[in-house]
Structure formats: structure tokens, C-alpha cells
UniProtKB/Swiss-Prot annotation:
Belongs to the peptidase S10 family. It is found in: Secreted. Disulfide bonds join C86-C345, C249-C262, C286-C313. This is Serine carboxypeptidase-like 32. It comes from Arabidopsis thaliana (Mouse-ear cress).
Length: 463
């Protein structure tokens, strides 16, 4: 019989093996060292490329952060931003949930005390090709981009990433994201779910447990209806404009944009939103260089598209930082000499390359995942005008799920953080006073909510 000392040694060796087994030669080549401006931390992080198509030379860029403590026992979470065309490195990692936030000059980094890798191992992926550092050597690939293309490439990425980091293959796996990732996340989850049913190739199995969606684009008709209703309800547009839209627009129809009154009414909302930050109605806009202030023409050309976006000042700081030679070299994005022109959102994906497919609704996928027993949580910052809380509530109501627990406030540090409701198979919560990118506005509350999600328990429902 083993004594206490031997048991301790055995446990230590098991833990050590868990770390060592994650360090494949490829993984060690991706280990980030001497990252410019990085605060001193005890966890490791890795960055680099995973080739998803050898023939076309298509590769996706990732940045992976071990959990701050006990990475060998904590789950793995993939974070995706939307767009289509926006970077999970520039937004999720840099402005929201990553451990290193870019300062207000783009010169250095500051530690994020509310980083989500306090609770999990976090993997950021720039997808599809053409986003951030991700690329293809075959230019025709860029004209094939769409939801299905992105889901397939993301799945291939995961399979190859797990070969590089085998210690994470069997961990509980979750997918999280916001805005247009409201499409990406369930679509990728569906691919994983379907592929996992292939009992003849168990080596491809991914231990998917659930999805987490923030201010997500979900269903075309409900998203647009909620967008219009929210703008009127928050006094952004006149009663007359609202009346015209309600009378002339049928967002369930493919031809609604051919109706002159409908298009002009929607244009009027966009015109008014030009004056403020649509993604956060009650915060100031950045005046020195605001892509939002100058984006009215882009909105008009991308109707009926809905796309991601955040505080343009933060976007600018990220652009400065990730175009530095020393930063690109440290992240293994380039050799530090032949630099890439990194942008936080690639407008070409919508404006020039087109987007070949976008599901009108992912609610059928919600139903499929719920029936499969996966955890589905949705949250919404209630001051976001782009993918507003009304849109999300309309979408959830469309599912007609039985209510499990009554609508009630949830709390963080004795204050009301938002409201919360559990349905059979789905959990919905709001964040009071948060805009589109909720963790940027409510970092402490978001971390607490994320922890509750991982544990499958409600956030605090009393002070």
C-alpha cells in the first residue's frame, strides 16, 4: 500500500506529465517569450499558425493562454469575434477578456485582473482566412468565404491544434463569442456535434460541452425587428420614421430592401446613429479618428449586413500595437522583417470579396444543440444598439421554450448586474449598462458570469 509521501509524489508526477505532454515540438516553437511590454505573469502563452489547407496554403492564426492556475484541470474555451472579418486577437484578447490589454497609445500592455483565463484555458482564433494575421496563398479562397467555409476551416483548425496540444484534447470544451460570432459559434458547434457521431473515427472526438453567446446575431427577421424597435424605444428616431419602417418593411422577406420606403426608413436610423456610438448608446465617441463617425456610407453599402465593431479609439491603439515589428515577431506572425499589415477588421470581406452564405437563422441549430444536451447560455449588454437586447429576446421567444425559473435580477458584489431567466435548455441574462462588447464595460461582472457558465450554475440571485 502506498504511503502518503508516495501518493504525493505520484500526484506531482501526474501533474508534471500533464504539463510536459502539452509541450510537443510544434507547441514549443509557438511559445511566446519576450513579448513587448508584457507584465510579469506565471502562466504561459503560445501563438502561431495552423495550416488548414496545404494545397491552397491557407493558415489560421491563434493565440492561446494557459489558465492562470491549474491549467491541467481547467476546461478549454475557444473565443471567436464576428464581423464577418473582425479579429479575435484585436477585440477579445486585447480589449475584453485576455490577460494583456493594450494601453491608450498602443505602446505597451497592462494586466487585466478580470481576464477569463483565471477560470479556463483560453484560445483565440482569427478566422476565416483574411482576418487579422490569418491568410491564404490562393487568392480565389477569399471569394469563397462564408459561414460554412468558416465553420469547416475552424473545425480543421481544432483537429490540428489538438495534435499540437494533445493534453487539451480530452478537456471539457466550450465555444464562446459575440456579435456575428452568434452565427460562427453554433455553426461550429453543430459541425463538432455531427462529426462526433462518427463512431468509426473516435480520434476526431471533441469533448464539446456548451456554447456562450454575447449580443449575438441570431435570426435575420428578429434581429432587424429588434434593431428598429430598440432605436425607436431609445428615442434615436422619430415616430414618423418608425411608422414608415413598420408599415413598409418585412424583414422576413428577401425583397424587403427593394421597397423604397423601407430602405429610406432604415437609412434614416443609420443616419441618426452616425452621431453617436451605436454599440454603446450612452458613452462618448472617439473624436480624433472615428471609423464609426465616418461609417455611414459603409452601412449603406452593406445593408442588409450587420457587422461587428467597438470603440474606435481602442481599435486604433490595437492597430498600432499589432503592426509593430517586434510584436509580430514575438507572436510568430512574421519574421519581424517582412511585416503583415494587420487590421482589426478586414472590410474587404464584405465590401469586395462578398460573403457567400449567411444563414438567415441559427435558431434551428439552437434547437439541435439543446436536444443534444449541450449548455446554451446567451447574454446581452442592454445599451448596445447594434445587436440589441430586444433582438435577442425576440429570437429566444421564437424558440418557445418552457420557462424553468422566473425573470429575476442577478447580482455581483451586492449590486444588480442585470436580469436573468432560465428556460428548459437555455439560459439568458442581461448586463445592466453594458454595450456591445460586454466584458469591456463590465469586466468583473463578466468574469463572475463566465465562471457561473462554466460551472453550470446561475449567477448570484441575491445580494
Amino acid at each position: 500500500m502506498m504511503n502518503i509521501s508516495n501518493v504525493s509524489i505520484a500526484l506531482y508526477l501526474c501533474t508534471l506529465f500533464a504539463f510536459v505532454s502539452s509541450d510537443s515540438p510544434e507547441a514549443m516553437r509557438d511559445l511566446v517569450t519576450n513579448f513587448p511590454g508584457q507584465p510579469k505573469v506565471s502562466f504561459r502563452h503560445y501563438a502561431g499558425y495552423v495550416t488548414v489547407n496545404i494545397i491552397s496554403g491557407r493558415a489560421l492564426f491563434y493565440w492561446f493562454f494557459e489558465a492562470m492556475t491549474h491549467p491541467n484541470v481547467k476546461p478549454l474555451v475557444l473565443w471567436l469575434n464576428g464581423g464577418p472579418g473582425c479579429s479575435s486577437v484585436g477585440y477579445g484578447a486585447t480589449q475584453e477578456i485576455g490577460p494583456f490589454l493594450v494601453d491608450n497609445k498602443g505602446n505597451s500592455l497592462k494586466f487585466n485582473p478580470y481576464a477569463w483565463n483565471k477560470e479556463a484555458n483560453i484560445l483565440f482564433l482569427e478566422s476565416p482566412a483574411g482576418v487579422g494575421f490569418s491568410y491564404s496563398n490562393t487568392s480565389s479562397d477569399y471569394r469563397k468565404l462564408g459561414d460554412d467555409f468558416t465553420a469547416r476551416d475552424s473545425y480543421t483548425f481544432l483537429q490540428k491544434w489538438f495534435l499540437r496540444f494533445p493534453a487539451y484534447k480530452e478537456k471539457d470544451f466550450f465555444i464562446a463569442g459575440e456579435s456575428y460570432a452568434g452565427k460562427y459559434v453554433p455553426e461550429l458547434a453543430e459541425v463538432i456535434y455531427d462529426k462526433n457521431k462518427d463512431n468509426e473515427n473516435l480520434s476526431l472526438h471533441i469533448n464539446l460541452k456548451g456554447i456562450l453567446l454575447g449580443n449575438p446575431l441570431t435570426s435575420y427577421a428578429e434581429d432587424w425587428t429588434g434593431w428598429v424597435d430598440y432605436a425607436w424605444n431609445h428615442a434615436v428616431v422619430s415616430d414618423e420614421t418608425y411608422r414608415v419602417i413598420k408599415q413598409s418593411c418585412n424583414f422576413s422577406s428577401d425583397t424587403t430592401w427593394d421597397v423604397k420606403d423601407c430602405k429610406e426608413g432604415v437609412d434614416e436610423i443609420l443616419k441618426q446613429y452616425k452621431e453617436i456610438d451605436q454599440f454603446s448608446l450612452y458613452t462618448p465617441i472617439c473624436m480624433h479618428h472615428s471609423s464609426k463617425v465616418d461609417s455611414y456610407a459603409n452601412y449603406k453599402t452593406t445593408i442588409p449586413r450587420l457587422f461587428d465593431g467597438f470603440d474606435p479609439c481602442l481599435d486604433d491603439y490595437a492597430k498600432v500595437f499589432y503592426n509593430r515589428a517586434d510584436v509580430q515577431k514575438a507572436l510568430h506572425a512574421t519574421d519581424g522583417v517582412h511585416l503583415k499589415n494587420w487590421t482589426i477588421c478586414n472590410d474587404d470581406i464584405l465590401n469586395h470579396w462578398n460573403w457567400t452564405d449567411s444563414k438567415r437563422s441559427v435558431l434551428p441549430i439552437y434547437k439541435k444543440l439543446i436536444a443534444g444536451g449541450f449548455r446554451v447560455w446567451v447574454y446581452s449588454g442592454d445599451t448596445d444598439g447594434r445587436v440589441p437586447v430586444l433582438s435577442t429576446r425576440y429570437c429566444i421567444n421564437k424558440l418557445e421554450l418552457p420557462i424553468k425559473t422566473a425573470w429575476r435580477p442577478w447580482y455581483h458584489e451586492t449590486q444588480v448586474s442585470g436580469w436573468f431567466q432560465e428556460y428548459e435548455g437555455l439560459t439568458f441574462a442581461t448586463f445592466r449598462g453594458a454595450g456591445h462588447d460586454v466584458p469591456s464595460f463590465k469586466p468583473s461582472e463578466s468574469l463572475a458570469f463566465f465562471s457561473a457558465f462554466l460551472n453550470g450554475v446561475p449567477p448570484p440571485l441575491s445580494r
